[in-house]
Every structure is written in structure tokens, then in C-alpha cells.
């Protein structure tokens, strides 16, 4: 039976493959890519009907009602971004994840700094994700990375992300880089570097091969922010203090050079 499958699998028309694969669970699709080159080629089309069906089935409809997912143009990329989005079980109790699955909302709680981590951490490879802050920044608005051991909430208005040796962050309010409770200089290294404006796109670039963390703003590379990162599992993380502020995060995959 297995030999018959291997013989006929490469010759099955794409429209028949779409019908067959539409009945499979997402976790089974990867195994299908290993059957033959023809099936692998089929799944390389990230906008085919199978990826479309999986995407529309799993990604909340709310996520498609604005331009949030335009940075990930294919159905497969949108699906992947959803599985990397904010973790509703790994955030401050003063934060909730909106129905679109990609945006967190900080409730207006006084004297609290509140954060959230992404669902999936990274220890190998190169990864990029986009962060967009909606609403006033307040006195603290930090974007960066953290391990699972970093605190995600604290009393007072405090640069929580970067406050210990388990987190690294860039405070968009004063352009300071933060780690282990210390400021590591102004970023980017420009005279009178412009401050972040609400709604601008921040792209975080984590290179686990070179152990660096970098940022882009509005598609302009700002330089390497942190070097010599330890070999740990890092999660996309933010920390905020302003009530009713909202922060969206969309995972992009491997960054494009140039």
C-alpha cells in the first residue's frame, strides 16, 4: 500500500490534492510535505486553498478587519503569525488580549507596570516581528525580549522590561536601552534621535545565531541594540503603564536582509 502511494502521489492533480488535504489537521500537513517533491511544491504555494482554509478557520475574523496583517501577505504567513501572537496566559492580570488575537489592551489600573510575552520563544535562527503602539506611551513603553523567568507585572511605573538579567528592552519614551536594571545608552546612536510617534511600525530583529537584538522603525534599520545575548529561549515582550493603551504584535518570520 505504501509503495503504491509513493508511486502515484507525484501524479495526483493539484485540485485533487486540495480536496484531500482540506480534511487534514494542520499538524498533519507537515508530514505531507515530506512524501514527495510534488507535494512539497504544492505546499510551497502559501496562498493555495489549503492554507486559505486553515487560515480562515483558525485566525479570528476580527484580525482581517483592518490593515494589521498586511505585513504578512500570504495565508500561511498569517496563520504562522497567529500562532506566534501574544499569549493570553502569559501576561499581566491587568492586560487582556483582544478578539483579533494580535492586540493587547492594558486596563486603566493605577500604579502598575504591565507586560505580555508572545506564545513562542526562540533559541535558534533569525526572527523578526512588528510591534505597533496605539494610544499614549505614558512614562514607560518598552519593547524587546525576555525569558520566561522575567517578571511580567510590578507595582508602580517602572521600566520592567530590562529591569533584570532576564530581559532586554528599548524604552520608546526616552530612547534608552535597558538591561539588568541599567541604562545602556541612547538608541539609535544619532544626534537628537527622533522619539517614537504613536502608530509608527517598530520591527524587532532577534538573531540567535549572532546573539544580537536590533530594531527598525518605519522600515529604517536603526542598528544593533544589544550584542552577546546568552543562549536562552527569548520571547517577544512589551511593558506598558498607560491605561487603555493597545499594542499589536505580528510575527514576520526570518528577516529579509537589505
Curated annotation (Swiss-Prot):
Copy the pathway line from the protein's UniProt record. Answer: Protein modification; protein ubiquitination
Q: Could you tell me which residue ranges the B30.2/SPRY domain spans?
A: 64-256
**SMART domains hit by this protein:** FBOX, SPRY
Disulfide pairs here are none
GO cellular component terms, A-Z: neuromuscular junction; SCF ubiquitin ligase complex; synapse
Name the Pfam families for this protein. Answer: F-box-like (PF12937), SPRY (PF00622)
What is the protein name stated in its UniProt record? F-box/SPRY domain-containing protein 1
Organism phylogeny: Eukaryota, Metazoa, Ecdysozoa, Arthropoda, Hexapoda
Amino acid at each position: 500500500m505504501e509503495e503504491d502511494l509513493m508511486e502515484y502521489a507525484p501524479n495526483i492533480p493539484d485540485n485533487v490534492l486540495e480536496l484531500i488535504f482540506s480534511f487534514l489537521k494542520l499538524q498533519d500537513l507537515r508530514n505531507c510535505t515530506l512524501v514527495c517533491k510534488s507535494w512539497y511544491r504544492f505546499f510551497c504555494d502559501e496562498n493555495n486553498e489549503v492554507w486559505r482554509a486553515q487560515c480562515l478557520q483558525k485566525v479570528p475574523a476580527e484580525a482581517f478587519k483592518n490593515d494589521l496583517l498586511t505585513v504578512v501577505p500570504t495565508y500561511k504567513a498569517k496563520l504562522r503569525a497567529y500562532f506566534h501572537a501574544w499569549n493570553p496566559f502569559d501576561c499581566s492580570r491587568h492586560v487582556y488580549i483582544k478578539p483579533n488575537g494580535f492586540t493587547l489592551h492594558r486596563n486603566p489600573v493605577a500604579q502598575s507596570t504591565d507586560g505580555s510575552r508572545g506564545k513562542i520563544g526562540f533559541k535558534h535562527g533569525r526572527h523578526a516581528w512588528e510591534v505597533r503602539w496605539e494610544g499614549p506611551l505614558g512614562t514607560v513603553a518598552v519593547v524587546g525580549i525576555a525569558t520566561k523567568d522575567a517578571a511580567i507585572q510590578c507595582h508602580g511605573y517602572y521600566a520592567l522590561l530590562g529591569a533584570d538579567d532576564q530581559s532586554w528592552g528599548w524604552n520608546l519614551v526616552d530612547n534608552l536601552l535597558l538591561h539588568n536594571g541599567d541604562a545602556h545608552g541612547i538608541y539609535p546612536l544619532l544626534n537628537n534621535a527622533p522619539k517614537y510617534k504613536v502608530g509608527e511600525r517598530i520591527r524587532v530583529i532577534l538573531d540567535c545565531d549572532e546573539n544580537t537584538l536590533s530594531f527598525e522603525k518605519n522600515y529604517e534599520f536603526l542598528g544593533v541594540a544589544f550584542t552577546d545575548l546568552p543562549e536562552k529561549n527569548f520571547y517577544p515582550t512589551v511593558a506598558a503603564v498607560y491605561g487603555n493603551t493597545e499594542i499589536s504584535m505580528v510575527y514576520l518570520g526570518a528577516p529579509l536582509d537589505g
